[in-house]
Amino acid sequence: MFSTATSPYDDLVIKATDENLASEDWALNMDVCDKVSSDGQNGARQAVTALQKRLSHRNPNVQIYALELANSLAQNCGKDLLGELSSRNWTSALDRLINDRATSTPVKKKALSFVKSWAKQIEETGDPNLGLMGELYDQLRAKNHVFDEPEPTPESAEEARRRQEEEELQRVLELSKQDKGGRSLFTYQPSGSAGASSSSAANNNTSPSIPQSQAQPLAQDQAQSQAAPQVTGYAPQPQKIYSPQPLEPEPPRVDLNTATCVRAIYPFTGQEVGELDFERGDVIKVLDRGFKEWWRGACNGKIGIFPVTYVEALPEPTPKELQEKAQEEARVFASLGLVDQLLQTLKGIDPARGDKLDDHPEIEEMYQASVALQGQINTLIKKYSDQKAELEHMNANFIRAMGQYEELRNGPPLVQAQPFGYVPPQPQPLLQQQNSYSYQQYPQQPQQQPQPYAQAPYAQQAQPQLQPEQYAQQTPSPAAQSQASYTAQQQPYPAQVQQDPAAASPPPNQPFYHHGGSTTSVNRIPSAQTAVQPQPHGAPSFPPSSPPTRQVTEPGVAGLGAGDQQAWDQYYQQHGQQAPHSSQHPSQPQSQPQSQPQSQPQSQQGSYYPAHAQAQGYQAAYATVPDGRAYASPPLPGTQQGQGVEGVTAGMDRMSVHAP
């Protein structure tokens, strides 16, 4: 039954009558007028309903802006809007507003003036159905309300000068009518002697320049000296003597190129960043004339450039005007205590106790006086906002000038001389990242082991790279396992990166371990339970190995797989051979030349150690096999090829042995 939907005009009217506006926003008012004109009678009804809500607002600014918007609609939206202004709801709202004691005086005066103008405008339409506004006007006039005429528009300088000239002319005419100059005593002589006529003409010609006190005796003497009878007749009216008095000097025209303040004669809306927006009549303070067509100025608290053709020059204020403005400003600041007193008085009124504003007439007086200050306060706010923007602009220019002065005074900064051959350190994030990966992601970092000897069967064979979980779970196996079981535990080795063998040498004064590549359990790498030594810079990133624990054996019997008799027995059972005596090593079948012991990857870690240790390690690793024959290429010159345990012990004498 009752619609709760909000009108589309509510937001527009609220925005156009905002209480925080310093003055009427004519652009928004015109937008509302355009919308009402396009919507017709329905739009007019909704707009007047929204304005009626704003009239009930207690803020005087909102009420004044609502009345101004209603007047704009009445002047631009035609008969549909005038019919809504003559409705019972709108006229009742105006009647309550005018007769309310709490309504401020400026609002009441503006409402009365608009009621009179609207009643006259509606009467001119000749529609008898629009008579409510006229009835309201008659009722208010019967109550002795004063209907002030709208304030006249300020006249231009040309009109003021013309009006002043006319007033001066009328004043001179009135003075000339009052001053006859004694010419009423002169008589007219139609005929007479030439001398008489000439003397009479002379007297008539000279009479205007003779004062009145001297003209009367002179006329009497002439009348007595004449013997001929004089005929009295027509006495001429005194002629109008116009002696124009000098007018007040016209104020000199102000040059636009020297004026400090200009006034906008057209509205301007900036299209680019930095352009200053203003309305017609705004006063702009000129700050800079850097360009011919565009100047920089301050207006409404903003600084920007504006076109010169949109403004006119304003004369400089006189000392009297400056004094009046200073006195008015002082009165405004002196009245601020009145506003504080009003607030304190309003805080002491409690409606819960039954207090009413009607019981305190002093509150109404203070309120009306405070409302009268609002326009002056808005003017001062605009004035000081412009000064603030100007000071900020001046401060920015000063800081820029100070920086340039210091730069020119001190000169450019001197470059500090560096010693000869100095190269600043360069950050190597990629190298550090690769080093961090070499400690953590070693399975993905394949390395190429340098081969000190040219070995026929192993020259093209890639060394296996096991995953970390395989290193942790793999158990030592005997040297004599089948090729299938050995290759099943290996994984494909990715493409290897060739490295410089010199990079494998550790830095000086750093501890390192070097173990010869041996198939025995003598030169075992320390157990995985001990702390892993950090790899030196440039070393291959092999994962830590977990070799079996070294078992104590008798000297001379520390051959391949010594101490693991069960594994050797299993090996001989698979190949159908008889186990030899403990002093001899079994010969490895020729059908498996490619098989290697499980400890072979451990022997490849010789790249951690110096070059001479690598040579000894590879010699010890490939010099002997269980059958005592050479398994790889011949040894280096100057070395002997041992057989069995003797060969192993001979190799052990030439390298350092570290206990685990």
Swiss-Prot record:
Region of interest: Disordered: 146-254, 437-660
Any single GO BP term: protein transport to vacuole involved in ubiquitin-dependent protein catabolic process via the multivesicular body sorting pathway
Topology of this chain in the membrane: Peripheral membrane protein
Keyword entries, A-Z: Endosome, Membrane, Protein transport, SH3 domain, Transport
Span of domain UIM: 164-183
GO terms for MF: phosphatidylinositol binding; ubiquitin binding
Entry superkingdom: Eukaryota
Function noted in UniProt: Component of the ESCRT-0 complex which is the sorting receptor for ubiquitinated cargo proteins at the multivesicular body (MVB).
Protein name, UniProt field: Class E vacuolar protein-sorting machinery protein HSE1
